[in-house]
Amino acid sequence: MALLVGCGEDQEPERARAFWDRIQTEDYRSWERAPGYPERSPSRAAHGDMVDIYVNDVVTQDLASPTRLDEWSDGAVIVKDGYEDGELCFVAAMSKEDGEWFWVEYDGEGDTLYSGQPNLCTGCHSLGDDSVRAFFLP
């Protein structure tokens, strides 16, 4: 069983609730899948034993860039559904706005567990390309 590690604390509950409503309205599961994750895939990270990862059109456009990017564009959204033993346990999402990432993790029912920029999120994600660890900048 994989260890589920959360991001620390719920720093921005109202923003997290609005973000949940937004990704539900946009039907994030209809978005493109992240590179390397064409279907539910095993995870070696802290977010469950299996994951589905979705990216919005801003990330899709960045990935298609013919030139090397140093960072993801504002408006980028990445959503990861995390599963343990086949059951949706949480939804982890990140959104880039004004050059800063906002992280949020919800339980399987959509209740906020963590939000904002908690140290556990930023500490782990700082190792990725502009804070994204699942795939690389083009």
Positions of PLM-derived features:
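Sequence context surrounding c-type heme c attachment/ligation sites in exported
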Residues: 8-48, 58, 63-138
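His/Cys-centered metal/cofactor-coordination and adjacent catalytic loops
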Residues: 55
